[in-house]
Amino acid sequence: MKYSIEQVMRLVDHSGLKPYLTEKDIARLIEEAKDMGNYAVCIEPIYGKFAKEYLDEKRYKVKLDVTIDFPFGSLATSSRKKIIEDSDYADEVDIVVPMGYVKSHRWDYVDQDLTDVVKIAKDHDLVIKIITEDGYLTQDEKDRLYRSVIRAKPDFIKTSTGFANKDYCASLGNAAGATPDNVSLMSRIAEELGSDIGIKAAGGIHTYREIESIIDAAKRPIDPEKLRIGMSGTGKVFEEMKKIKK
């Protein structure tokens, strides 16, 4: 293996985002993240304060990451800003781009929204990752949106939610989750713009080999401050890597 279990697991935001999860499921998610050495847990904000109290009580070093306007990116900017303000108990937020504006090519609205949400996050000392949901984008839209995101100066640009409509993605010739090609494009555009923005790949990541190809495409240090992998099936990859190691 090119990368060790410890290196890979430290990049992971261990995710539990299904709407039917319970407090017991969230507690289990946190315990799994701690045991596997993951950087963060990524959850819906309904369980944010529960998770914060659980982490504090256990004194775990796992970071708390909550999603905003997820998975659709359909709320007004004012609502998005308010939810970020209300999430100041967290360490990080992952927010979807305003997708309707993106698909309508209202780039003025997109740029203003992204500038506003990044500012609010920074005002509350939150790491912010902006999700492009690139399976919904044409090649021209990817090129334009990636530039908008990078210029807004969030901490990370992120590929996908993991909940994209596969039929719509397929109609554009796209996969519904993270791909090395899109990660590579993010990296190239960031370099062109003189940015060292972090990259987070998420959606449809199930194997070590997929992770390896994404890490190589990102051209980022093996450091959770610059590179993340979001996945719910972390345990399967953990077990797979232990077998490969043997």
UniProtKB/Swiss-Prot annotation:
<dbReference type="InterPro" id="IPR002915">
    <property type="entry name" value="DeoC/FbaB/LacD_aldolase"/>
</dbReference>
<feature type="active site" description="Schiff-base intermediate with acetaldehyde">
    <location>
        <position position="158"/>
    </location>
</feature>
<keyword id="KW-0704">Schiff base</keyword>
<dbReference type="GO" id="GO:0016052">
    <property type="term" value="P:carbohydrate catabolic process"/>
</dbReference>
<comment type="similarity">
    <text>Belongs to the DeoC/FbaB aldolase family. DeoC type 1 subfamily.</text>
</comment>
<dbReference type="Pfam" id="PF01791">
    <property type="entry name" value="DeoC"/>
</dbReference>
<keyword id="KW-0963">Cytoplasm</keyword>
<protein>
    <recommendedName>
        <fullName>Deoxyribose-phosphate aldolase</fullName>
        <ecNumber>4.1.2.4</ecNumber>
    </recommendedName>
</protein>
<keyword id="KW-0456">Lyase</keyword>
<feature type="active site" description="Proton donor/acceptor">
    <location>
        <position position="200"/>
    </location>
</feature>
<dbReference type="GO" id="GO:0005737">
    <property type="term" value="C:cytoplasm"/>
</dbReference>
<dbReference type="GO" id="GO:0004139">
    <property type="term" value="F:deoxyribose-phosphate aldolase activity"/>
</dbReference>
<dbReference type="InterPro" id="IPR028581">
    <property type="entry name" value="DeoC_typeI"/>
</dbReference>
<dbReference type="GO" id="GO:0006018">
    <property type="term" value="P:2-deoxyribose 1-phosphate catabolic process"/>
</dbReference>
<comment type="pathway">
    <text>Carbohydrate degradation; 2-deoxy-D-ribose 1-phosphate degradation; D-glyceraldehyde 3-phosphate and acetaldehyde from 2-deoxy-alpha-D-ribose 1-phosphate: step 2/2.</text>
</comment>
<feature type="active site" description="Proton donor/acceptor">
    <location>
        <position position="94"/>
    </location>
</feature>
<dbReference type="GO" id="GO:0009264">
    <property type="term" value="P:deoxyribonucleotide catabolic process"/>
</dbReference>
<dbReference type="InterPro" id="IPR011343">
    <property type="entry name" value="DeoC"/>
</dbReference>
<comment type="function">
    <text>Catalyzes a reversible aldol reaction between acetaldehyde and D-glyceraldehyde 3-phosphate to generate 2-deoxy-D-ribose 5-phosphate.</text>
</comment>
<dbReference type="InterPro" id="IPR013785">
    <property type="entry name" value="Aldolase_TIM"/>
</dbReference>
